[in-house]
């Protein structure tokens, strides 16, 4: 891997050692499953849960891994409960962390999905809705103009934000080009290569 998950792992270890909870969000179920398995193997002394819509396992865990949409839906259900003075018995929540007292950090893996035309609004509203005391950790290897993105987070959430970037690559990048040629030019191209080899 590229090592971009390391800040999230530090946060998980730190906050769990303080008796707090962490939510780790991903854009797709497959990545949630992968992160759940990877983190559970790497940190067997920490309790992990997963919520993807298809799977609901250990929702009381110290670290919950889920899609961003599940976090969004639960946050807004909790807001509706508070606003309408409803009891939790009337609404089924995917998880029931006390956001104010227990939750310390939310990791947004592949945070560049905030630029997705269809799903970006969910990511934006989730970030804007999180209480100020909850640390936001955004991970991306491909986000465009990260400085502007950090400034946006500061503006909408009143949080001091730091950008940690690393231009070096842990995994070397090799460029390949795959070309197709119409059959009529293939014979000519093949003959030219054959002549150069001989």
Where are the regions that the model predicts?
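Conserved nucleic-acid-binding Ia/Ib motif block in the N-terminal RecA-like helicase ATPase lobe
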Residues: 20-73, 151
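Walker A (P-loop) phosphate-binding loop of P-loop NTPases
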Residues: 1
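Conserved nucleotide-binding/hydrolysis micro-motifs of P-loop NTPases
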Residues: 29-31, 55-57, 69-72, 112-113, ...
């Amino acid at each position: 891997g590229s090592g971009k998950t390391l800040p999230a792992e530090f946060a998980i270890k730190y906050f769990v050692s303080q008796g707090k909870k962490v939510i780790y969000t991903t854009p797709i179920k497959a990545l949630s499953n992968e992160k759940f398995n990877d983190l559970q193997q790497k940190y067997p002394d920490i309790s992990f849960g997963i919520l993807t819509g298809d799977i609901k396992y250990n929702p009381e865990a110290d670290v919950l891994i889920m899609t961003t949409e599940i976090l969004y839906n639960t946050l807004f259900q909790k807001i509706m409960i508070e606003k309408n003075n409803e009891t939790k018995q009337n609404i089924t929540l995917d998880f029931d962390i006390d956001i104010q007292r227990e939750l310390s950090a939310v990791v947004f893996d592949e945070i560049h999905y905030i630029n997705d035309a269809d799903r970006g609004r969910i990511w934006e509203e989730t970030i804007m809705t999180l209480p100020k005391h909850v640390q936001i950790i955004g991970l991306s290897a491909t986000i465009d103009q990260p400085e502007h993105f950090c400034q946006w987070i500061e503006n909408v959430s009143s949080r001091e934000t730091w950008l940690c970037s690393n231009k070096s690559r842990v995994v070397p990048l090799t460029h390949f080009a795959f070309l197709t040629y119409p059959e009529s030019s293939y014979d000519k191209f093949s003959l030219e290569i054959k002549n150069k080899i001989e």
